[in-house]
């Protein structure tokens, strides 16, 4: 079916060291649809246009100004998707990864710490309505864990924990070869936990984070 749709093609490479008939090797076809990815950080939003085998064709970034709102965030996302569509119209879908906490089931960015002005943003619904394309939404660390499972050091592992350390601490869990999601659609989150109620005041307003 994928061959009929032009997504994959047979590779001419032959495996001569294998007993019996040579297996058919499939590769992503040159004319296969592309995919667009969006990554939401506290300071910027990034977009990438890539092939199905993860060859990056174009990247763009919009830095956030002061007084960011949910409406402005969605508009920035639309601007970036439009820029990607200038290069390629044949798009299979759009993936959105965001800092958390997020509501994965409903595609909503909830209330990330130190992400002032951004609360309960239905970014998945907004992008889906704008472009009429399949849209996938998840926590950024879950997406990172999936990338490690598919393309990185986790390919041979069925169970592992990804620990992301930047200006916060986050995690993604792969269990039984699949990214773990709770039944409520919320991600596993290690970051931004108060461990000393008498500690230094954090930018979130709590102490000892």
Language-model features, listed with the residues they occupy:
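Gly/Thr-rich phosphate-binding beta-strand-loop-beta motif of the actin/hexokinase/Hsp70
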Residues: 22-57, 162-175
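Glycine-rich phosphate-binding loop and adjoining helix at the ATP-binding site
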Residues: 59-83, 87-159
């Amino acid at each position: 079916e994928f061959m009929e749709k032009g997504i994959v093609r047979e590779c001419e490479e032959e495996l001569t060291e294998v007993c019996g008939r040579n297996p058919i090797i499939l590769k992503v076809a040159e004319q296969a649809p592309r995919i667009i990815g969006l990554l939401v950080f506290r300071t910027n939003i990034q977009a990438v246009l890539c092939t199905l085998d993860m060859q990056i064709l174009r990247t763009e970034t919009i830095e956030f100004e002061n007084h960011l709102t949910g409406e402005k965030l969605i508009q920035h996302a639309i601007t970036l998707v439009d820029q990607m569509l200038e290069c390629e119209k044949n798009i299979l879908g759009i993936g959105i990864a965001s800092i958390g906490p997020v509501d994965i089931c409903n595609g909503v960015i909830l209330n990330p710490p130190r992400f002032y002005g951004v609360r309960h943003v239905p970014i998945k619904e907004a992008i889906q309505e704008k472009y009429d394309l399949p849209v996938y939404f998840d926590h950024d660390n879950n997406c990172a864990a999936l990338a490690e499972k598919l393309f990185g050091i986790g390919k041979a592992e069925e169970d592992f924990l990804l620990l992301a350390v930047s200006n916060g601490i986050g995690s993604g869990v792969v269990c039984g070869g699949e990214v773990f999601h709770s039944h409520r659609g919320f991600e596993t989150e290690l970051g931004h936990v108060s461990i000393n109620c008498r500690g230094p005041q954090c930018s979130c307003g709590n102490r000892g984070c």
